[in-house]
């Protein structure tokens, strides 16, 4: 099987809402501190906590074909391990994302297969990067404005990548002012072209630092280049737990 086909399994949104003209927010120090804090909080509702495990069902539609896969996913900080559960032909395969590097691991292979930056822009690999985006950690706030999405008051962030390790150079990100969760994101390549659009739903809740907060239940990812391509990620069985660093040890995973 070609590696680009395998990428459709990678884990780590469907109608755009009404967008109204944005109102500029002054970029003074107090406003910037508020914007940064809100961005950090929005990340907590998508998995950027001390340790988390979940199951994800993925349905991907591309070129008239539909693929369905289920994965068990472990996440801690910027590290993520996806273990294929179904269909049976891919069960046991693994994908490791560590410090923005990515590897594919298959039973029977003596060495992991590294996924190049170019390959990360293809197929499901780009969707995996969208699912695991660390907005507060990997991006700088160039500007933020008052806006609305689906009639909900938001801040619209214009984010710029801090370095070239991340897949997307720029992101436009709508964050709910009241609920402190990301609702929509547009992802741009280095050339300035919009590549993907993501929509987020939050029907789960988790406890973070003793406080209940909404947690992502579904992501719908649309391809701006190929209008018919669509990926839906549904999250289940979410558990906050301690995850050992050894879970992301590449040498141990290929044994």
Please annotate each region the language model reported.
Residues 1-4:
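Positively charged n-region of N-terminal signal peptides that target proteins for export
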Residues 23-40, 47-50, 57, 67, ...:
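Flexible, processing/modification-adjacent segments and terminal tails
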Residues 50-81, 85-87, 180:
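N-terminal, post-signal-peptide region of Sec/Tat-exported proteins
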Residues 70-72, 93-94, 172-174, 199:
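Short, surface-exposed charged micro-motifs
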Residues 79-80, 102, 112, 182:
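Hydrophobic residues embedded in beta-strands of well-ordered beta-sheets
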Residues 152-248:
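Gly/Pro-enriched, hydrophobic low-complexity segments
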């Amino acid at each position: 099987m070609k590696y680009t086909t395998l990428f459709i399994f990678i884990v780590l949104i469907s109608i755009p809402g009404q967008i109204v003209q944005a109102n500029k927010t002054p970029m003074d120090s107090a406003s910037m501190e508020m914007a940064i804090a809100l961005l950090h909080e929005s990340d907590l509702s998508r998995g950027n906590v001390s340790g988390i495990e979940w199951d994800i069902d993925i349905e991907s539609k591309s070129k008239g074909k539909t693929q369905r896969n289920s994965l068990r996913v472990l996440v801690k900080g910027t590290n993520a391990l996806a273990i294929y559960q179904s269909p049976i032909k891919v069960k046991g395969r693994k994908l490791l994302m560590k410090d923005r590097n990515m590897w594919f691991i298959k039973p029977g292979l003596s060495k992991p297969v590294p996924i190049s930056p170019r390959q990360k822009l293809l197929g499901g690999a780009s969707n995996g990067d969208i699912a695991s985006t660390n907005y507060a950690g990997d991006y700088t706030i160039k500007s933020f404005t008052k806006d609305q999405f689906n009639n909900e008051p938001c801040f619209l962030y214009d984010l710029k990548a801090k370095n070239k390790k991340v897949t997307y150079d720029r992101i436009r990100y709508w964050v709910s002012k009241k609920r402190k969760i990301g609702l929509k994101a547009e992802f741009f390549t280095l050339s300035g072209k919009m590549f993907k659009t993501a929509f987020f739903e939050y029907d789960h809740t988790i406890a973070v630092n003793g406080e209940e907060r909404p947690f992502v239940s579904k992501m719908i990812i649309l391809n701006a280049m190929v209008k018919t391509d669509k990926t839906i990620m549904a999250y289940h069985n979410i558990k906050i737990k301690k995850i050992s660093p050894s879970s992301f040890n590449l040498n141990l995973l290929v044994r």
